[in-house]
Amino acid sequence: MFLFKINKDFDFLKKTFLKFFQQKHIINRLNDIERLNISGWEIWLQVEMLIFLCAQDNVQEAYREERCFMDQRKEKLKSLCAIDFIVREKGAHSFIPIEVKQNMEAAACIRNMIKDFDKYNNIRQLELPSERDLWLIGIHRKVEQDYLFKLIDEKLDINHKYVFTQEIK
């Protein structure tokens, strides 16, 4: 049952975000960001994602910046954090937590994604908006898939079948 839910969530998120990144206005804007070397566009992207998610027929609910209390036994410096998105697919009983990171460089993007993974593991269990696993979405310049797997494998033990890459152009 556990793997079934992971596979179902992966398929749902992959289809949904593939559709998001195929929108012409998103492609054009991301190409402009690349061309002009603009940084700090993560919030813009998250707002676009939320608008998109809320318009999807297969999404029951989607929220951005879901606040959670940190487990003070694990995290001494901060008492509160936010999960970028929680999304509930139609027919599902619980939300899927999602963290989004952007960086032009793949290595920095992966490092920041791992920090979000660690942050999520420091949230008080009672505060988690879901019993489902956290999913990470990273947006960075294109790199070879072997290099991407090397970056991931240095820090996480993750099945590569749950890593999806899509060039945006």
What is each model feature region?
Residues 1-55:
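Interdomain/boundary linker segments immediately adjacent to catalytic/signaling cores
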Residues 2, 153-169:
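Non-catalytic C-terminal interaction segments of nucleic acid-processing enzymes
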Residues 30-38, 69-74, 101-108:
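Surface-exposed cleft-lining segments at the edges of enzyme active sites
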Residues 38, 43, 60-92:
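Active-site metal-binding core of divalent-cation-utilizing nuclease and nuclease-like domains
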Residues 54-58, 125:
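A general structural signal for alpha-helical elements within enzymatic catalytic domains
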Residues 84-106, 120:
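Conserved catalytic cores of phosphodiester-cleaving nucleases, focusing on short active-site segments
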Residues 103-127:
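Mg2+/Mn2+-dependent nuclease catalytic core
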Residues 124-152:
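Nucleic-acid nuclease catalytic cores
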